[in-house]
Curated annotation (Swiss-Prot):
Protein's UniProt name: Succinate--CoA ligase [ADP-forming] subunit beta
Names of the cofactor(s): Mg(2+)
Sequence ranges assigned to domain ATP-grasp in this UniProt record: 9-244
Broad class of enzyme this protein falls into: ligase
Keyword Hydrolase: no
The protein's Enzyme Commission number: 6.2.1.5
Catalyzed reactions per annotation: succinate + ATP + CoA = succinyl-CoA + ADP + phosphate; GTP + succinate + CoA = succinyl-CoA + GDP + phosphate
Sites where the protein binds substrate: N264, G321, I322, L323
Function: Succinyl-CoA synthetase functions in the citric acid cycle (TCA), coupling the hydrolysis of succinyl-CoA to the synthesis of either ATP or GTP and thus represents the only step of substrate-level phosphorylation in the TCA. The beta subunit provides nucleotide specificity of the enzyme and binds the substrate succinate, while the binding sites for coenzyme A and phosphate are found in the alpha subunit.
Length: 388
């Protein structure tokens, strides 16, 4: 789960991480008033959406007066901001952050992230702040410093010093930088985050260290422990189908292709999408119904897949274990009765009660393609899509 920049900065301040003073507003008039209250110009007007790359898309603007802040906010609010992360359709801007401008001496990058390779936590830092860190990692990886932290031992002062020295910070900035790293790390651990990022972290002309931007990703599986964070969720920033799927405990991610797929298990789902692509088609979604799915969940899964107008065919790929094949088959029949399945359906299943599952489907009278293997299923899907 993600939250907005202004919400993240509120969390930052509770952990002793300095940020510019700012106000979140949702009208142009309020933006002008907020600009006048901040105590000096220029101010920065920043569109509040969950996607990155806002500056390049025109979502971050400098205002030298309250009237200019009002005008800029008016142009942003109600518009669709297009960034490299939103896709061509963009994201509707419903809030802006009006923030005090600061004098920047140096821009840095700083983040704390879960590292799967070491099963630990890594502090990532770079002097290439304010830039697309993925691009920096690809073109000039030597510019990124990594400090690995054992999660059982926790953060120590030497980790912070290692990062500070690696960034060539002036002596007077090392102590405030250490405080920022400590706060960021504690926030990461306390809230079960997968990423906490400041880009850029700035050194001001008066030697202060400050978070100019803020981003945090929370582990969805741990949100039951953080009701305060869950209350910050903005479903307007999320894909409507993904929000709907979450109501039924379905793991769904919308994609750009035209082959819907329903699978049990994340690994099998990713392999299924790979096979679809190898067969020359494109997956329209990732949908893991999980091992404990029942007929109702299967029906809801079909309803969500069919809500996507791009879908021209559906591939069901199930390895029956906890989710038995007969339960899946009953769910398919139930979905066909209650939800008009108006696209071709390809079903491949193996495992527990597979013969009973195949019998249920065979006697249902449904128009579907039964595949003997995953390769056969993908080939059938590709044929159906090509003929559509």
């Amino acid at each position: 789960m993600k939250i907005h920049e202004f919400q993240t900065k509120e969390l930052f301040r509770t952990y002793g991480i300095p940020t510019p003073e700012g106000r979140m507003v949702n009208t142009a008039e309020a933006a002008g008033e907020a600009a006048g209250e901040l105590g000096g110009f220029p101010v920065v007007v920043k569109a509040q959406i969950h996607a990155g790359g806002r500056g390049k898309g025109g979502g971050v603007k400098l205002a030298k007066s309250a009237d200019e802040a009002k005008s800029l906010a008016g142009a942003m609010l109600g518009s669709r901001l297009v960034t490299p992360q939103t896709g061509p359709e963009g994201t509707l801007v419903q809030k802006v952050l009006v923030e005090q401008g600061v004098s920047i001496a140096k821009e840095l990058y700083l983040s704390v992230v879960a590292d799967r390779e070491t099963a630990g936590i890594v502090i990532m830092a770079s002097e290439a702040g304010g830039m697309d860190i993925e691009a920096v990692a690809e073109t000039t990886p030597e510019k990124i410093l990594k400090v690995f932290v054992n999660p059982l031992a926790g953060l120590s002062a030497f980790h912070c010093r290692q990062a500070a020295y690696g960034l060539n910070l002036p002596a007077e900035a090392i102590k405030p930088f250490t405080q920022v790293v400590s706060g960021l790390f504690k926030l990461f651990v306390d809230y079960d985050a997968s990423l906490v990022e400041i880009n850029p972290l700035i050194l001001t002309t008066d030697k202060a260290v400050m978070a100019l931007d803020a981003k945090i990703n929370f582990d969805d599986s741990a949100l039951f422990r953080h009701k305060d964070i869950l209350a910050l969720r903005d479903t307007d920033e999320e894909d409507p189908l993904e929000v709907e799927a979450s109501r039924f405990n379905l793991n769904y991610i919308n994609m750009d292709g035209n082959v819907g797929n329903m699978v049990n298990g994340a690994g099998l789902a990713m392999a299924t999408m790979d096979i679809i692509k190898l067969a020359g088609a494109e997956p329209a979604n990732f949908l893991d119904v999980g091992g404990g799915a029942n007929a109702e969940m299967v029906e809801n899964g079909f309803r969500i897949i069919l809500s996507d107008p791009k879908v021209k065919c559906i591939l069901v790929n199930i390895f029956g274990g906890i989710l038995r094949c007969d339960v899946l088959a009953s769910g398919i029949v139930q979905a066909a009765r209650n939800t008009a399945i108006h696209v071709p359906l390809v079903v491949r299943m193996e495992g527990t009660n597979v013969d009973e599952g195949k019998r249920i489907l065979a006697e249902s009278g449904l128009d579907l393609h039964s595949a003997a293997s995953l390769k056969d299923a993908a080939a059938r899907v590709a044929q159906v899509v090509a003929a559509a």
